[in-house]
Amino acid sequence: MKLRDSLAENKSIRLQAEAETWQDAVKIGVDLLVAADVVEPRYYQAILDAVEQHGPYFVLAPGLAMPHGRPEEGVKKTGFALVTLKKPLEFNHEDNDPVDILITMAAVDANTHQEVGIMQIVNLFEDEENFDRLRACRTEQEVLDLIDRTNAAA
């Protein structure tokens, strides 16, 4: 499942969301995936438990988090949700706080997680200007167009 197709089909984009804590921000993304029948509600708690155990493992770059759990923690099918925050939040990451872009990922297996999920997100942000372009998006279509332009350039 491609990032763009998942976001469009699942209507799992939320822009300029308001959240008080990093946990609230993660829940917004997971709730979009629950609504799209991509994950079970327990996926949220699995992510929180993993952070408690391993720290903020999914904060990948300055301003960017990719919350995800394991396939057996409630994933029904592979999918993505994209959330931008109105106000950046601290995730307690030493180098990459604060975060205002979250791409929540659910993968049916570890191979999909590595090869499909992470690679598509790396591709999107290979051009660092895409961070600011994404922050400037105000509609779902603007996000999809940005991904299309990035894919066309790749």
From Swiss-Prot:
List, alphabetically, the GO terms of the cellular component aspect.
Answer: cytoplasm
Induction trigger: Induced by L-ascorbate. Repressed by UlaR.
Q: Which residues form the PTS EIIA type-2 domain?
A: 6-150
| Subcellular localization, as worded in the UniProt entry | Cytoplasm
The Swiss-Prot or TrEMBL record annotates one GO molecular function as: kinase activity
Q: What is known of its domains?
A: The PTS EIIA type-2 domain is phosphorylated by phospho-HPr on a histidyl residue. Then, it transfers the phosphoryl group to the PTS EIIB type-2 domain.
What name has this protein been given in UniProt? Ascorbate-specific PTS system EIIA component
Q: Which organism is it from?
A: Shigella sonnei (strain Ss046)
